[in-house]
Amino acid sequence: MDKRLLDILVCPLCKSQLHLDANKQELICKADRLAYPIRDDVPVTLVDEARSLSADEIA
């Protein structure tokens, strides 16, 4: 993912910075414990598309 794009993307719920998990192709919001998918190199930052993360996945 382009670093410039990653620098401007934020969580739609809390506006926190998102962190890339390149292995899982997801953008992670640690504050809300959500993972937003990246499909075909396009980040899908819709809350309905996000999956909840466990505390272990955040660490």
Curated annotation (Swiss-Prot):
GO-annotated cellular components: cytosol
Pfam families xrefs: Trm112p (PF03966)
- What family is reported? Belongs to the UPF0434 family.
Q: Which HAMAP family match?
A: UPF0434 (MF_01187)
The protein in question is named UPF0434 protein Pnec_0311
Origin species: Polynucleobacter necessarius subsp. necessarius (strain STIR1)
